[in-house]
Amino acid sequence: MATATVLEKANIGVYTNTNHDLWVAESKPTLEEVKSGESLKPGEVTVQVRSTGICGSDVHFWHAGCIGPMIVTGDHILGHESAGEVIAVASDVTHLKPGDRVAVEPNIPCHACEPCLTGRYNGCEKVLFLSTPPVDGLLRRYVNHPAVWCHKIGDMSYEDGALLEPLSVSLAAIERSGLRLGDPVLVTGAGPIGLITLLSARAAGATPIVITDIDEGRLAFAKSLVPDVITYKVQTNLSAEDNAAGIIDAFNDGQGSAPDALKPKLALECTGVESSVASAIWSVKFGGKVFVIGVGKNEMKIPFMRLSTQEIDLQYQYRYCNTWPRAIRLVRNGVISLKKLVTHRFLLEDALKAFETAADPKTGAIKVQIMSNEEDVKGASA
């Protein structure tokens, strides 16, 4: 076991529970365990987590206590979008050393089942995915994690390193959806995943791109990220089919009813909302595809006959696999820039304020990140 410099701050984490409380309290491993290395298992490293993004799923676990069958049953630590510094390594770890900057891929698959052995470890039924109950998450000052799932990020900022997790979600969608250069693409939802998917689709050569949302502010933010994106504000008083007509108009400068009107070949659905999925289905061309990234309710109504008579493929994804090295290259080489996405930053001790900001649409927050050190907050904001 090798360690970095002596640390003084106690380990604390951000918890929720079945009563939907949210609080900060002491966490494992303890500072004493970090200093001694006694909590490290073979193959693990200790990471001082420097930056963690708040995901919509974190807010949902706090407010609702569950996502589908994943249920909070006791005191539970949130967070799975993290980057930090390696401060200790087990004796059998040779490719990482104290001082290395890493992004933490928050899953621990079994490495023995068919999905794992065929390279699709996101399908591992025994996977331990950090922040998904009952597995505690990364919103802690220190965490032990298998070294194989800690990816070196070089001089990349910890902010960008934490954003590699949602970027991985969008990269999985881009790859599995079959997006090609020049494809007209619809992105539904201008939240963090939708915005990162917009950046990814543009980098992959999609053109033109229309992005939708119910919030004018988020559409304006999308325009600031990708100036040539076309925006469409979803009208909540209209049917999914009528909103689709407006979307097709947006692709065609208001001439969506013309015989030769362009329709998207691919819709990347980033909300999981029933009406948005339906609008995407009504929008795409004959033989097109609706690829659902967003997580929605257990059951929803969709226009089945539209799918059938238009030969529209409806496809889904579950997390990601084998995306992190590519995500790192894309960010480090400037192909995708994530720098504008973090709009609010808070210290770990102020996690309640951070979550309240992330959960309140009135704040205009895009991505809220929680940082372990005051200098990280000040440095990132500068």
From Swiss-Prot:
Residues binding NAD(+): 192-193, 213, 218, 293, 317-319
Reaction(s) this enzyme catalyzes, per UniProt: L-arabinitol + NAD(+) = L-xylulose + NADH + H(+)
The protein's Enzyme Commission number: 1.1.1.12
Keyword field contains Nucleotide-binding: yes
Biological role stated in the UniProt entry: Catalyzes the NAD-dependent oxidation of L-arabinitol to L-xylulose in the fungal L-arabinose catabolic pathway. L-arabinose catabolism is important for using plant material as a carbon source. Also active on ribitol and xylitol. Not active with NADP as cosubstrate.
Subunit structure comment from the entry: Homotetramer.
PANTHER family reported for this sequence: L-ARABINITOL 4-DEHYDROGENASE (PTHR43161:SF12), SORBITOL DEHYDROGENASE (PTHR43161)
Entry protein name: L-arabinitol 4-dehydrogenase
